[in-house]
Amino acid sequence: MDRYFIVSKVGEGGFGSVYKAMDRQNADRLVAIKEVRLLGLPQQAMIEASDAFEREVAVLSQLDHPNLPRFYEHFQTPTSWYLVMDFIPGETLEEYQSKAPDGRLLLSEVLDIGLQLCPILEYLHAQNPPIIFRDLKPGNIMRTPTGQLDLIDFGIARYFKPGQAKDTVALGSLGYAAPEQYGKAQTTPRADIYSLGAVLHQLLTTRDPSDAPFDFPPLRPKSSHTPNDPGSLTTSIVDVLMDKLETLIASMLTMDVAKRPPDIAYVKQELQIISQLWSDIYRGYWRPQRGMSR
């Protein structure tokens, strides 16, 4: 640890903490150091912490993407394990949403969030074998001061294993995790599609999916939107766009894996169409009622 100067603690979890530090051997480069404390843990907790640490090291050390933290090294002391990676400035998407009026983000912003996350998941799923993140939620998405989104916390990410009936360990965050993550089947990239659907639904409705897992009410009542200038738009056009978004998110959240979108590229394409339509038609002239805003 002499190589690193600890600046501050930036996070804490069940098994340890995350620190912002300077790497003295690399021009005081800012890094994040994830500490897993093993001292005093019960045997089962020690096994879980060790497994999560080893998974994160195995996955991060193989990845190179501008929206993922770069892995530098890992080491251990008699009482703790440490993982050193890029320090990502900013706040989590969960923190960012909590500061919005009524917790509601602009629809254009939610679409941008989805379009930023899709290429990251696409990159993970394109690995050989595919990497399934398995824990996509606002608390694991960092938003930098420039608005860039990065995924953090690969503690339960796993490689897809062809022919395996189900995951070795059932893990995930309640409400965001796909039903197959609860031990009923092996997770595939479509599990991340489900989680992305849960995130988008929460950003659009402010409804926390952990309050009632697998229950996702409609985004808005039918014909609940009225243009500011009735002459500029018709309610039917608004409904067409919102129905398209509703249909996409509902398909992402279906319990049946086979009925979800085939891959994240399809989701990205649909979001691009909706986002472009929104931009081309509305140009800021229309402001929906509570629940959806531009």
What are these regions (language model features)?
Residues 119-131:
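Protein kinase catalytic-loop region centered on the HRD/HxD motif
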Residues 40-62:
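AlphaC helix of the eukaryotic protein kinase fold
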Residues 192:
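Conserved catalytic-loop aspartate of Hanks-type protein kinases
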Residues 167-180:
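Conserved activation segment of eukaryotic-like protein kinases, specifically the C-terminal portion
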